[in-house]
Amino acid sequence: MKKLMMILAGTALMVTSAPAFAGNDRPIAVGELPATAQQFIKAHFAGVEVSLSKVDEELFDKDYKVVFVNGAKVEFTKNGEWKDVECKYGEVPAAIVPQQIRDYVAKNYPDRKITAIDRDRRDYEVELDNGLGLKFDLKFRLIDIDN
């Protein structure tokens, strides 16, 4: 019985303390971003003022988000690699988009701009200014279209 009470008390302690580790969002200075993220901002968003930069610390993960005054947003991994770029009122800088994806969009949607790009371990997703979503595998082959 004593053992059961100890297990229950330990479980209750873990459950009540878990929220303290999850979702710890806090603003940070741009200088606190990983060096890779700072270099990315200087290379692709030079001259655009940062409105907000923040870190989101989860129990086993951390990521960063930067919002610019022009409405653009960039999310970075814990290592400072970009994972999501959204340019609400403009176009994603061309140098961010892999050449094969730019070529595909230019050929098949010549009057469209890429307004967002997202990448992960499995694929790239881009959104065009008409709301059309295109998904590419890591070899840049189109694998899905989302209207």
Label every PLM stretch briefly.
Residues 6-13:
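Hydrophobic helical h-region of N-terminal Sec-dependent signal peptides
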